[in-house]
Amino acid sequence: MGNLVIGSRGSELALWQANHIKERLKKECLIESEIQIVKTKGDKILDTPLNKIGGKGLFTKELEELLLKGEIDLAVHSLKDVPVVFEKGLDLACITKRADVRDTFLSVKFPDLMSLPKGAKVGTTSLRRSMQLKMKRQDLDTESLRGNVQTRLKKLECGEFDAIILAEAGLCRLEIQGAKYRKAFSVEEMIPSMGQGALGVEMLKNHKHFATLQKLNDTESAFCCRLEREFIKGLNGGCQIPIGVHASLVGDRVKIQAVLGLPNGKEVITKEKQGDKTRAFDLVQELLEAFLQSGAKEILEKAQLF
C-alpha cells in the first residue's frame, strides 16, 4: 500500500501542524505519509472579515470534500476551526495534546492592553477576541486582520495596527517572538475559542487506519475539547461568532468557563461551572441552560447583524 495522504492548508503554521502529525504517524503508528496542500475558502478570500464570508467550515470544507472522495486519507486542522457537526461518514480520529490555549497581545510600542492610547487600532480575526477586548476597553478600535501569522506581524511592524491579538500556540509552534512587546492574557482575562491549542485529525470513520490514530490521541485534551464542542453545539454556534469556552481538569474536578456576547462588548454573558469529572457533560448542559435563560439565543441573533 502507498503512503497515506495528509490534507493540509498551505500556511507555514498549517504545514507545521501537518508535519507534526506526519512525524508522529511514522514514529508511533509506523505509518508513512505525504502532505497534499489544499486551498480552502477561508484562504482564498482575504479581503473580507471571516464573519462576513458566511457559512461554517471556512477552513475545512474543501478538505472534507477530498476526504469523502477518498483523495486524501486524513485532514489536519486547528481544532478551533472544525465545525461541531460533521459531514456524514466523517469524524475526528484523534485530538492531540493541547499546546498553550491563551490569546496573546503583541505590540511594537505598547507593553500591554491597558497602556494603549484611546482609539488605538487593534487587529484580530476573531469576533470573540474583539468582544473581550471591548469588555475591557470600549474606546479601542478593533479591526479585521486577515492573513497568515507572518502577514499579520508585518502589518503590525509597518504601523497599520497599534497592537494585534494572536493565539499563543501558533507563535510557540513557529518559534516566533512576534514583536517587542508580547503578553499572553490569562484564561480569565480572555476565554479562548473551543479547542484552541489542540489539533484535530479528521478521517472517514470506516477508514482502515481510523482506530490506529487513537495512538495520537491525548485523553485529557480530548475530554476537555469535547466538553467545549458540546457547549458550542448546544448553542448552534461556530467559530465565526463571539463565543469563548474553556474546560480544564484539575485532578477529578472539571471547570468550564464560557463567554458570549455582541462583538462591541455591550451585551455579554459570562458564566462558569465546576464539579466532579464524572458529571462533566451534565455540567455542560447546566451551563447551557444558564446561558439560554440569560438570553444567549437572542444575543447571538443580534450578533449576526454585526
Per-region residue spans from a language model:
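Short, structured active-site "lid" loops
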Residues: 48-73
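A conserved helix-loop-strand patch within extracytoplasmic ligand-binding domains
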Residues: 79-80, 88-140
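Small-molecule-sensing regulatory modules
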Residues: 1-46, 52, 135-306
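Short glycine-rich anion-binding loops that position phosphate/pyrophosphate groups of nucleotides
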Residues: 79-82, 169-171
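N-terminal winged-helix
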Residues: 12-24, 55-59, 84, 104, ...
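Extracytoplasmic loops/domains of multi-pass membrane proteins
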Residues: 66-68, 82, 87
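Short, Asp-centered acidic motifs that coordinate Mg2+ and/or phosphate
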Residues: 72-76, 162-163
